[in-house]
Amino acid sequence: MPIRNSKDLPSIIVLVLLCLLANGSHADEDLAYLDLSLEQLLHVPVTGSTLTEETLKTVPAAVSIFTREQIDRLGMDYLYELLNLVPGFQFNRNASNGLAYTYSARGRRTTQQSLEVMLLIDGKVVNDPRAGSPDITLPLYPLARIERLEVIRGPGSALYGSSAFTGVINIITRKQQKSLALAYGSQQRRQLEGFWSQSVGGWESDFFIHAYKDNGEQFTLRDSFSGQPITTSDPRQQLAVDLALKQGDTGISLSYNRAETEDFYQSENTANGFNANERELWHIAFDQSFKWLPDTQSQVVLSYQQFYYDFKLYVTAPGFLANYSNPPSAEPFWGDAGLAGESWRFTFSNDWAIDDQSSAQWGVQWAQHEETRASARGNYDFIQLSHGQFPVAFYGDEGKVFPIGTEASQSNVGFFVQYLRDLRESTRLTLGGRYDDFTELAGRFSPRLGLVEQLNQTYSLKLLYGEAFRAPTLAEIGLINNPLLFGNPDLNHEIVKTWDLILMGNWKATNLSVGVFENRYEHPIETVFVGAARTYRNGPEEKSQGVEVEWAQELSTHWSLRSTYTYMDLPASAFREAARTGSFEINYAAEKWNWNLLGFYQDERQTPITPTSEQTLDDFWMLNTQWRYQFSAGYELKLQVKNITNEEATTPAQSLGKLDGIPNRGRELSAEVEWRF
């Protein structure tokens, strides 16, 4: 396994110390962390599933909710970490780059990106315009920005169209906050987070900033070309700035995100001192609510998104092309690539209150995606190498620029309608669908049906059916002249048809949800090997099924417990996914402080060694803890330990030959002081 070169800190002592601190207090009043009881949690609004306010008991979907109070107590910093506490979700760190933390829902992830999950922030889509994934545009989304998180498992195309394939993540951001937080920790972690809100001239403004930098952790990896051990690191830095303005029914939002990393892996290859990448996302949105029909609330949203991704890598080792280049050169084949895309979205939606028992939602959405740049400068000929044309021309240090994408565009129009009705006091019906029309691809209709029955005061039953599709992205279709990965212009939609049956039990101190699901995939888009390179294709029909359990328990006035478990029967193509996952969270809250211990588990997975064989990676538990103390005058201290036991957890690669998988970071310690004013 990869060796992690970090000092063996006394994690057990740290954990025991925190436990002793917890047991030493006998305060009678609860801190705000437990202000929201399990019974109250059942009535937290859920809006991402139907575009109307539902609750956990009535929403026609498999949903997990995290409120601000719950997020505050977790020993986690980023969205991809928290998703490990959701049934059916799991994370994967791959070798695309040092920031490549991706996630999947219900065992479906065919590339190094989360193409099958849609990410919404305040109702706006932020998936990458050209590659279709949210984890590229926002690889490390800070939890500090989130007021409420809704994680929906299952198809969402009946409302959102393509990419809402196996899940939808709906983030509602924090508003009207004033705070400043400073943190320092392992790998010289330096972090600043701040909120500011102000009312000026009738406009309410909300500002957020997140700035982060660390020196990275040292790892011993196998060199991608020689196979010999090398020492590398994964330093990173990030800047996120959000500004939201609102006056009455009018809203404007502007977001900027930038992230950088170097060394480690880049596009599955090592190259210390050369590997580097940086990405930049701009997102601006305007929304206006109004009434133009009786009993109907309407909204228009116009958004624009621009994304840049620049990276440098070695394609071959020094000397590899010495006998196959003209003029002959022993220089490594390096590439300096730039990818960029932009998207426009316009949505017109309506919520019609028909009567006391029923409502209808309908609307239209137009989207235009364009790959505005896809080129790379290299010192050898990309085209000749990609097509096996030897000798390959050598251009020296100046290099030559080659296209690596078709710089095409893709547009679609979607029409959706949904009908909600209380058939009787205990039965709620959801019926809807959406038709999407594409310029270059066949149209697709995605239906949904949901029945929610309140069996009694304790139990409720949900029977759900939905279909979703995912259109091939501009990157999957148009990637060219790439010796590592190339596109397939003949790809078609992939389709999933899903059944869910969910039983919920709710008692005064206990919430329990047990669900079973079945997915049937038609024309699934797969990543396959052609020699050592990869490409995409529509594969044969596949099926998966599973069980998801979520349990929350208030043990006493101060103690609470939450746990999840997932078991899935997955197709052979999902060898990179864990068939079993689980998590637990133990929390103790008192008047001034809070202590939390959480852990998540991922079963064995496989990483590809040859086009026809895989290597099994060990399963692992990851444990985190956090202790918070609230001083007077709004000051708060947070001590956090991630990966308490320094577990050497590895996750699967996309390319061949990485016997040990991709290493994750070891133990990380940090201290943070926050001032709320």
Annotated model-derived regions:
Residues 14, 197-199, 235, 239-241, ...:
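Conserved C-terminal beta-signal and adjacent last beta-strands/turns
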Residues 125-153:
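Short acidic/polar hinge/loop motifs at secondary-structure boundaries
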Residues 273-291, 339, 404-410, 460, ...:
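Outer-membrane beta-barrel signature, preferentially recognizing the C-terminal barrel domain
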Residues 45-64, 80, 84-125:
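Extracytoplasmic beta-strand/coil segments of soluble accessory domains associated
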Residues 244-260, 279-441, 454, 510-516, ...:
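Face-selective signature of the C-terminal outer-membrane beta-barrel domain
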Residues 158, 170, 183, 195-277, ...:
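Periplasmic-side early beta-strands and strand-to-turn transitions of outer-membrane beta-barrels
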Residues 422-429, 516-521, 537-609, 640:
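Gram-negative outer-membrane beta-barrel transporters
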Residues 27-72:
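Short, acidic, small-residue-rich periplasmic hinge/interaction motif at the N-terminus
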